[in-house]
From Swiss-Prot:
Protein name, UniProt field: Superoxide dismutase [Cu-Zn]
EC number: 1.15.1.1
Domain of life: Eukaryota
UniProt binding sites for Zn(2+): H61, H69, H78, D81
Main location: cytoplasm
UniProt binding sites for Cu cation: H44, H46, H61, H118
Annotated organism of origin: Prionace glauca (Blue shark)
Amino acid sequence: MKAVCVLKGTGEVTGTVLFEQAADGPVTLKGSITGLTPGKHGFHVHAFGDNTNGCISAGPHYNPFSKNHGGPDDEERHVGDLGNVEANGNGVAEFEIKDRQLHLSGERSIIGRTLVVHEKEDDLGKGGDEESLRTGNAGSRLACGVIGIAKD
């Protein structure tokens, strides 16, 4: 199964992310985001596909198991915690991520939810404060888009 997300925000940040999953295998995300400041930026699937008031309408990180925030390789993490994407000196982040907790079908599907790129680096839940355990201290939402089904 395939999916796509077009990221847009109020500023210069834009991007496209393609998703692919074969049977019960991991979801592969391949994408490019431009207009970022150089460095790492938090990258998450948020709970809702609602962008009526911009990216803030997307709600919190997708977290069906009520866990604390963590890194993509941690046992204790939100399903939507994808860690960071890293922008080069030109503000472009090109990436490929494989994730076993995401699904493109079934009751925990991320189709119809929002993908968000954040202003700051995600501390992966290791910041030592409550906000770290909720959001990774990733800061404001620079761009977002609803994940939709794509043609196979």
